[in-house]
Amino acid sequence: MAARGRSRRTLSFSVDSVGINRGESLPPTLQQPTPVFPVMEQKPLPLTGGEEAEYLLALKQDFRGAMRSLPCFIQPAAALRDVERYSDKYHSSEHTDGLMDWTPDWQRFPRELRIHARKPARDGVSVARSDAQSAQKKKKKKVREKEEVLIKLETLQKKEEQQSEEDDDDDNTEQKKKQEDDDADGDEEYDEEEFEEVILYVTCDGSNQSVWTGSGLTEGSVLQETDYIMSYFDNGEDFGGDSDDNMDEAIY
Amino acid sequence: MTAQEVRLCGLLLHEHFGEVVEKVGTHLLRSGAQNLRTIIHETGLSVDLVKKSLMVLVQHGACLFSSGRKGPGSPTEYRSGCDRILRILRYPRYIYTAKTLYGDTGELVVEELLQRGHMTMSGTVKTVADRLTQNMEEGRSMDYSEVSSAFSKLVETHFLQRCPKLAGAGTADTSAIPPTPESFPDCYKVPHMTLVGRGKRQLAAEDGEDQRNAKRQKMDSENSESVPGIYWQVNFERFHLHFRDQAIISAVANKLDQTSSEIVRTMLRMSEVTTSPAATCTKPLSANEIFRSLPASYNIPRPILDQYLTLLVDDPMEFVGKAGESGGGMYVVNLHRALANLARATLESVVQERFGSRSARIFRLLLRKRHLEQKQVEDFAMIPAKEAKDMLYTLLSQNLVQLQEIPKTPDYAPSRTFYLYTVNQLPTARMLLQNCYKTVANLIERRLFESKESKRLLEKSQRIEAILASLQASGAEPEQLTEVEEMITAPEKQQLDALKLHINKLDSAENQVDETIFLLESYVNSTATSTG
């Protein structure tokens, strides 16, 4: 429209009807994007306060906080740091406890979404299943696991000599395959593809027992199969990260 | 699924379900229906994480699955919709409504169901009883029957509904459209089940009673879970109807007076069960019925009621209409028209707050007179020409006002064409709705930014609070407590207070914008159903 009117002074639309008078000039053209935070001529109104608004606010913040602690809040697997540290073996299981608390009703979900959780290779026990349908299988397992705890204790002693190198690497799928073959339990269904790609969930023996049998095991040493509490494995990398703003307190 | 909606859904998923679910959810929103393999491949996450995220999304109703489009053998496809995820913004309002209607028990029932997505009745009752028992004094515990009765009341008034049974989750589903909850006749029937027991406190003081209760619970849990898989979910539509009614009543109270709003409230209450959710107006009610159903505290004589009704009918907002003369006059509440008027008032106030009252006058004028020329606008609005032109162009550049060309000749020659200014209410409402979504997304991002900036300070204060709590529990002296409190310096405390104030303001602003979103959404949906 403007290009065609370039050679002549008239514009393509009638100036009268749109309202531009002859003497006035058009406002300057914009050469760049509008500013990100433009100045507002009118300030916005203040928020409505009041009891209801505050109660709604409290409800909202409580809800957000509560959702973080539920099993549906999924944390990604923690990124591995540059160098493997000894304490990783004991720290990595802390985050995954919430995942096993939720036993969904598998009839309402498509079958392909079922996850078969694997136990770490250290135990000689059969693979745990997140299949909630079979309550009877659960009971059989309870009995079986108690017997197998004793067997496990013996095999653990043997295995610790053999697997001293492989212990530190939890994501070792070859170990898992070996264990799968040794396993006497024949009812399990495997997806060929998921067998290769799955990443181990390090669910320890202690946490599973507390889910299946309901015995009140204490946290800490039993959960991680060590004799020390978890702060023993703090590797000192978090020290000194606090604020250095207060320079009048000397740091020794 | 506009870009703003997807962005807001992503932020909501991130806050409530973590970043893994956010990735999977936004991918589904952007790409439509997909099967599991494609999702895994395109998001680049591990198989287990994707499976868990999909389960979480399905559990909360944000994702639906059905057998593939290519036939019974193809893999199941998952699709997600923005609407359900955007409801998360409104959760506090739902919980608060349940509290006002059914007390603390109702509030906790609705909160539990919102947190978990779908739950069985027995599971909900147990959890809520335990939570209530936690807050009660020592020695008292909450009885299951009280919680069950609150649950049943919620189901009877349709605030809760059964989840639709998914026909053969593993097998082929022939119907393309997933069944709605309403298509099942038992949707609102509570199964006949007796739950006997009391809530358990976490730290049990009386072991004997708890053991007895535990035994009885185990027996009853076997009884109740024999009812195969009836899951309950919150019925958002019913809550929305409630909010809509509340909006109409408060609008009448603001425009007229308290008594008229009570009359409208009575009319709406009487038509709660007889009106379908998509109805344009309620069923006609005779003035005699209204008179009989007015609450006892409002004993106004019959002729005064007639005068009020006439006033309501004559009001330009057209909340109430007259549908006939029998029974002393038949009156209806015009629901869709009321929603349209409320949306119009919202648009007008937006223009007023952003551009000033004179621009608002022009806007209202154009809404009423539909099409006006430049000169007519100046005359009717009584604003000098130059300023009127300026304001019109500002409104035009913000797309709140449109230009309509009416040619006099078949070649649209500019000198022989009328240019009329006009406002179309529905497209403008849609545009403002998208602006609202963008606003909420910006508020959330700003809040996350503020918390991230002061993350170290927040963590430090949390640690100190934990230390204080543990010291108090173990009974420490006041000097130790003050020593620990002094670990936070005064400037840090100021910073923390300012941060808390900002975060509260941003959160509160989100709640308020959501009220506008609700109004505009209801209006847009009501036009869709009436024209479609």
Stretches found by the model and what they are:
Chain B
Residues 1-44, 56:
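N-terminal alpha-helical scaffolding segments that mark the starts
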Residues 21-28, 106-111, 260-267, 348, ...:
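Hydrophobic residues on short alpha-helical segments
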Residues 24-25, 30-45, 116-141, 166, ...:
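Short acidic, hydrophobic short linear motifs in intrinsically disordered regions
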Residues 36-38, 51-52, 65-67, 75, ...:
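Intrinsically disordered, low-complexity regions enriched in proline, serine, glycine
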Residues 53, 150, 263, 308, ...:
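Residues in the recognition helix of alpha-helical DNA-binding motifs
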Residues 58-69, 148, 152-168, 301-302, ...:
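A short, conserved structural fragment
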Residues 76-111, 168-254, 335-364, 412-456:
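Short, amphipathic alpha-helical interaction segments positioned at domain boundaries
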Residues 398, 442-532:
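Long low-complexity, intrinsically disordered regions
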